[in-house]
Amino acid sequence: MSVWDPKEILDSIGLGKRTEVKRSTRVADAIRKELAVLLLEKIRDPKLQDVGISRVTATDDLTIVKIYYTIYGPHKHVKAVDKAFLAATGFIRSHLARTLNMRYTPNLQFCYDKTAEKVAEIENIFQEIAKERQDNGENS
């Protein structure tokens, strides 16, 4: 009769050992959280009202951070939001320097995240295919 060992069971399904997360991933996650707080509480620019941070990536040497954002609501004013982020970059970097306690604050690059639009396109294609199949099934 074998003794039940939870560590052995977790190891067998790949959950026993912690996987090490890269520092750049941890820093990117911290920056994403700080930016979310900044957008909600401190940045007063009306162009950034309907903006959310979808993901943040950082280079391994932490010199460049790419911040991907989405725009909620009916107005997709990407150029205006880009200009607003460009104007607020200094404020955002200084805030990140104070809160993250890093020796060097990375350069910030803001990029519009087109993932939501691509998902909507694919969903529309699937709906069209389903409608065509339904129409072909009725005509047969």
Swiss-Prot record:
GO terms for molecular function: ribosomal small subunit binding. The keyword Cytoplasm applies. It is found in: Cytoplasm. GO terms for biological process: maturation of SSU-rRNA. Its main location: cytoplasm. Keywords: Cytoplasm, Ribosome biogenesis. It comes from the Bacteria. One of its GO terms (cellular component) is cytosol. InterPro entries: KH_dom-like_a/b, RbfA, RbfA_dom_sf, Ribosome-bd_factorA_CS. Belongs to the RbfA family. One of several proteins that assist in the late maturation steps of the functional core of the 30S ribosomal subunit. Associates with free 30S ribosomal subunits (but not with 30S subunits that are part of 70S ribosomes or polysomes). Required for efficient processing of 16S rRNA. May interact with the 5'-terminal helix region of 16S rRNA. Monomer. Binds 30S ribosomal subunits, but not 50S ribosomal subunits or 70S ribosomes. This is Ribosome-binding factor A. It comes from Desulfotalea psychrophila (strain LSv54 / DSM 12343). The gene is rbfA.
